[in-house]
């Protein structure tokens, strides 16, 4: 199945049903009181995480999703039926972003989590709502409001513990092949990896972690060069980043400048991602004598001013890879998982939140003209008489 991690859709929540103007009629009661019911609320649109899905490919073919409209109110104080909701099933780790405002509308990182992305319209109010001591025969009602319409960009963020980044041909895919059962494509030309891939690394029985390999970055990726930085979003939920550095690039480029390029592109993309724990991994140490490799690595570390963890490996010959995986397992076991706090100020505002308050204050009210009722006398309304057999 083709891996699709981004799709654009248009969602439309259901319109609210209209309120109605109606009066109670019965034998011997020529002119009863108001009994117009409210309309039904429009259906909402949700996204729900489903662990059985792993791609957004379905949303490439069907781009429009809408919930049901609420029914109109009826006489006899009958309220209209609420419109059915529309639930869009998406892979775990999907977020919905408003295309026009770039606002993150929803994010589902757990199986079964369900979040509203489009609010249905409010129901209109029937004329019963406007009855008062000075208005015994109200002809006012309110119309149901339109459901919310949004254009969303669905983005799938892979849920991995370790994220790998580096220039093309640095050896990221080779490393994943050597430490897991994943088999990403490996070749001696740039951009062999075109889509992200995941590998599960088992350190000890019943303990494992997931490594994400993303396509390589080049200078200017933040401006769209190469494959751009669209795949860097997959690193946002990673707990540790491995920066793979080729100490002997096949094109003769400077490893120090290559490392600085990756760091610069990462910082341009997101300060939050750049602040994550990051380890340097020097690959292809078997291509030169050990002493020469150590000198080269020390030169790079000093040039970068690096004070964190760094490792020497040969991914193709599996030199140092086992030790690196054990260190990663120990580090993540002691590293608390990030818990994203939902702040009140970041709550998404939907339309029509104050609609009913405005309606009861006299705004958005529709008055129906009906001359047949203009001469209705309050004194003729004796109430609803119920006859009971003895």
Curated annotation (Swiss-Prot):
<dbReference type="InterPro" id="IPR027417">
    <property type="entry name" value="P-loop_NTPase"/>
</dbReference>
<keyword id="KW-0342">GTP-binding</keyword>
<keyword id="KW-0378">Hydrolase</keyword>
<dbReference type="GO" id="GO:0000287">
    <property type="term" value="F:magnesium ion binding"/>
</dbReference>
<dbReference type="Pfam" id="PF01926">
    <property type="entry name" value="MMR_HSR1"/>
</dbReference>
<keyword id="KW-0479">Metal-binding</keyword>
<dbReference type="InterPro" id="IPR006169">
    <property type="entry name" value="GTP1_OBG_dom"/>
</dbReference>
<feature type="domain" description="Obg">
    <location>
        <begin position="1"/>
        <end position="159"/>
    </location>
</feature>
<dbReference type="Pfam" id="PF01018">
    <property type="entry name" value="GTP1_OBG"/>
</dbReference>
<feature type="binding site">
    <location>
        <position position="193"/>
    </location>
    <ligand>
        <name>Mg(2+)</name>
    </ligand>
</feature>
<dbReference type="GO" id="GO:0005737">
    <property type="term" value="C:cytoplasm"/>
</dbReference>
<feature type="binding site">
    <location>
        <begin position="314"/>
        <end position="316"/>
    </location>
    <ligand>
        <name>GTP</name>
    </ligand>
</feature>
<feature type="domain" description="OBG-type G">
    <location>
        <begin position="160"/>
        <end position="333"/>
    </location>
</feature>
<dbReference type="InterPro" id="IPR006074">
    <property type="entry name" value="GTP1-OBG_CS"/>
</dbReference>
<dbReference type="GO" id="GO:0003924">
    <property type="term" value="F:GTPase activity"/>
</dbReference>
<feature type="binding site">
    <location>
        <position position="173"/>
    </location>
    <ligand>
        <name>Mg(2+)</name>
    </ligand>
</feature>
<protein>
    <recommendedName>
        <fullName>GTPase Obg</fullName>
        <ecNumber>3.6.5.-</ecNumber>
    </recommendedName>
</protein>
<keyword id="KW-0963">Cytoplasm</keyword>
<feature type="binding site">
    <location>
        <begin position="213"/>
        <end position="216"/>
    </location>
    <ligand>
        <name>GTP</name>
    </ligand>
</feature>
<dbReference type="GO" id="GO:0042254">
    <property type="term" value="P:ribosome biogenesis"/>
</dbReference>
<dbReference type="InterPro" id="IPR036726">
    <property type="entry name" value="GTP1_OBG_dom_sf"/>
</dbReference>
<feature type="binding site">
    <location>
        <begin position="191"/>
        <end position="195"/>
    </location>
    <ligand>
        <name>GTP</name>
    </ligand>
</feature>
<dbReference type="InterPro" id="IPR045086">
    <property type="entry name" value="OBG_GTPase"/>
</dbReference>
<dbReference type="GO" id="GO:0005525">
    <property type="term" value="F:GTP binding"/>
</dbReference>
<dbReference type="InterPro" id="IPR006073">
    <property type="entry name" value="GTP-bd"/>
</dbReference>
<keyword id="KW-0547">Nucleotide-binding</keyword>
<feature type="binding site">
    <location>
        <begin position="283"/>
        <end position="286"/>
    </location>
    <ligand>
        <name>GTP</name>
    </ligand>
</feature>
<comment type="function">
    <text>An essential GTPase which binds GTP, GDP and possibly (p)ppGpp with moderate affinity, with high nucleotide exchange rates and a fairly low GTP hydrolysis rate. Plays a role in control of the cell cycle, stress response, ribosome biogenesis and in those bacteria that undergo differentiation, in morphogenesis control.</text>
</comment>
<comment type="similarity">
    <text>Belongs to the TRAFAC class OBG-HflX-like GTPase superfamily. OBG GTPase family.</text>
</comment>
<comment type="subunit">
    <text>Monomer.</text>
</comment>
<dbReference type="InterPro" id="IPR031167">
    <property type="entry name" value="G_OBG"/>
</dbReference>
<keyword id="KW-0460">Magnesium</keyword>
<dbReference type="InterPro" id="IPR014100">
    <property type="entry name" value="GTP-bd_Obg/CgtA"/>
</dbReference>
<feature type="binding site">
    <location>
        <begin position="166"/>
        <end position="173"/>
    </location>
    <ligand>
        <name>GTP</name>
    </ligand>
</feature>
């Amino acid at each position: 199945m083709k891996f699709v991690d981004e799709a654009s859709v248009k969602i439309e929540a259901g319109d609210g049903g209209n309120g109605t103007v109606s009066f109670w009629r019965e034998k011997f009661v020529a002119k009863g009181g108001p009994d117009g019911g409210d309309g039904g609320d429009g259906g909402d649109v949700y996204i729900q995480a489903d662990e059985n899905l792993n791609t957004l490919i379905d949303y490439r073919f069907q781009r429009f999703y809408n919930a049901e409209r609420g029914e109109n109110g009826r006489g006899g104080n009958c309220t209209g039926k609420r419109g059915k909701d529309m639930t869009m099933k998406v892979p775990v780790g999907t977020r919905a972003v408003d295309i026009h405002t770039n606002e993150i509308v929803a994010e589902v990182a757990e199986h079964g989590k369900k979040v509203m992305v489009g609010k249905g319209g409010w129901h209109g109010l029937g004329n019963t709502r406007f009855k008062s001591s000075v208005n015994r025969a109200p002809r006012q009602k309110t119309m149901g409001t339109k459901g919310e319409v949004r254009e969303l960009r669905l983005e799938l963020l892979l849920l991995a513990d370790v994220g790998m980044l580096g220039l093309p041909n640095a050896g990221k895919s080779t490393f994943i092949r050597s430490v897991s059962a994943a088999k990403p494509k490996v070749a001696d030309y740039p951009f062999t990896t075109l889509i992200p891939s995941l590998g599960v690394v088992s350190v000890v029985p019943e303990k494992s972690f997931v490594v994400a390999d993303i396509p390589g970055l080049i200078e200017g990726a933040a401006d769209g060069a190469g494959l751009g930085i669209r795949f860097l979003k997959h690193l946002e939920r990673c707990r540790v980043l491995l920066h793979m550095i080729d100490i002997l690039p096949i094109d003769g480029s400077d490893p120090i400048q290559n490392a600085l390029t990756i760091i610069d592109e990462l910082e341009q993309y997101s300060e939050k991602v750049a602040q994550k724990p990051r380890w340097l991994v020097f690959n292809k140490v078997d291509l030169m004598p050990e002493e020469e490799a150590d000198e080269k690595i020390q030169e790079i570390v000093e040039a970068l001013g690096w004070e964190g963890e760094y490792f020497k490996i040969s991914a193709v010959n599996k030199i140092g890879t086992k030790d690196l995986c054990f260190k990663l397992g120990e580090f993540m076991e002691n590293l608390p998982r990030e818990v994203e706090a939902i702040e009140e100020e970041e709550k998404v505002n939907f339309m029509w939140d104050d609609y009913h308050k405005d309606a009861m204050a006299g705004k958005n009210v529709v008055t129906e003209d009906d001359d047949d009722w203009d001469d209705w006398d309050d004194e003729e309304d004796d109430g609803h008489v119920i006859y009971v057999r003895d």
